[in-house]
Design a protein with these regions (language model features):
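Short, surface-exposed beta-strand/loop "edge" segments at domain boundaries and coil↔beta transitions
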Residues: 63-65, 141, 246-249, 267-276
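Acidic, proline/glycine-rich low-complexity IDRs
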Residues: 135-138, 142-146, 292-332
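A short, compositionally biased micro-patch
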Residues: 109, 243, 253-255
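Compact, glycine/acidic-enriched structural inserts
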Residues: 261-298
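Short, surface-exposed beta-strand/loop micro-motifs that present aromatic residues
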Residues: 104, 239, 247-253
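A surface-exposed partner-binding patch
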Residues: 145-247, 322-331
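Conserved, surface-exposed functional patches that form binding/active-site neighborhoods
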Residues: 248-268
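Nuclease and nuclease-like effector domains acting on nucleic acids or nucleotide cofactors
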Residues: 1-102, 106-148
Length: 332
């Protein structure tokens, strides 16, 4: 079995920044987070400065795959913080991540830090998933016993994004958006699943609002945020939302137009600095649907298995909330 121990010996992506502080290149994030992100001497980013909550999770069982690890850790960390009475979980289900936040696995251990979604997206990196002992090539999670469709919290207005706004986006981007995603953006841009949504084939926990169209520069504006994500994707892909553990993207140019892909952070396969960006995305992106409608059809809304697993982890003492480092200072 090929395990994550390979990742421990591999040079992390962007290891050239080892021992340095990487600052946010765009004005919105640079203003919000002027301290940037320090990359340690081994090439792993240290996001602890931005941690709003921290959880520790027990070692995974023998034979666990990377998608199982990622999903189990996220829902267990959420449940542990919800059980602790953390204020961010006042308005979301126990297994969901608060909007605007994502979990980062600190390298070399089983510590998870809750950091702003736009901070973790700064650069390609390795962390505690790439350095874990799980099978990095075993994909997917256990099949669900039954699936219910996902529902979105839609705006009270007739549409979330107007046709005029969509045309403005297309003018800025230089191409027409693929049809299925275009329809979703108009109906539900900026909306999040009610509770959680799960793509069991990839173990994707989807609990964040999708990108929308804003009148001003913002980290949830479709055009602006894609300018911030060029370390992750080529211009053949348009990022459409943050999911736990990475980005969701739509193919907007070339073969497979309109198809949906998962771009994972902390990917143990991302080890060759000689790969050109186009080669890297071709090798690393994981398919999530032939078009956006197919992607939505793969999702299960609020599967009870998530809560069952998370409760077992918390009640058994395998997932627990721990104090946030005293130096953490979000958004200074």
């Amino acid at each position: 079995m090929t395990t994550g121990r390979l990742g421990q010996r591999a040079v992390p992506p962007n290891a050239a920044y080892a021992g340095q502080v990487v600052h946010f290149p765009d004005p919105v994030r640079a203003t919000r987070h002027p301290r940037g992100v320090r990359v340690d001497e081994h090439g792993y980013p240290d996001f602890s400065l931005y941690a709003r909550a921290v959880a520790e999770i027990a070692e995974p069982p023998e034979g666990f795959g990377v998608d199982e690890l990622r999903l189990t850790d996220y829902v267990s960390a959420n449940a542990a913080l919800a059980a602790s009475g953390h204020e961010l979980w006042d308005t979301v289900p126990a297994v969901a991540t608060p909007h605007g936040w994502t979990w980062h696995h600190a390298a070399g251990g089983r510590r998870l830090e809750l950091v702003p979604v736009e901070v973790k997206a700064l650069l390609r990196h390795h962390g505690g998933i790439a350095t874990s002992t799980v099978d990095q090539h075993k994909r997917g999670t256990r099949p669900l016993q039954e699936t219910r469709p996902v529902h979105f919290a839609l705006p009270k207005s007739a549409v979330a994004v107007t046709e005029q706004q969509v045309q403005g986006v297309e003018e800025d981007l230089g191409y027409r958006l693929p049809g299925a995603y275009r329809s979703f953006l108009k109906a539900a841009g900026g909306s999040a699943p009610i509770g959680t949504a799960l793509d069991a084939e990839l173990g994707l926990l989807i609990d964040q609002p999708f990108f929308t169209v804003r009148d001003e520069a913002a980290v949830n504006d479709l055009v602006y945020v894609n300018k911030c994500l060029r370390d992750h994707l080529t211009k053949d892909y348009l990022a459409v939302g943050f999911v736990q553990g990475g980005l969701l993207a739509v193919k907007v140019k070339g073969q497979g137009l309109g198809s949906v892909w998962f771009c994972a952070y902390d990917d143990a396969r991302d080890v060759d600095p000689a790969w050109a960006p186009a080669d890297r995305v071709e090798r690393l992106l994981l398919p999530a649907g032939g078009d956006f409608d197919q992607f939505l059809g793969r999702l299960a809304g609020n599967p009870p298995e998530l809560e069952t697993v998370a409760n077992l982890m918390v009640d058994g003492g395998f997932a627990r909330s721990v104090p946030v480092p005293s130096a953490a200072a979000v958004g200074e």
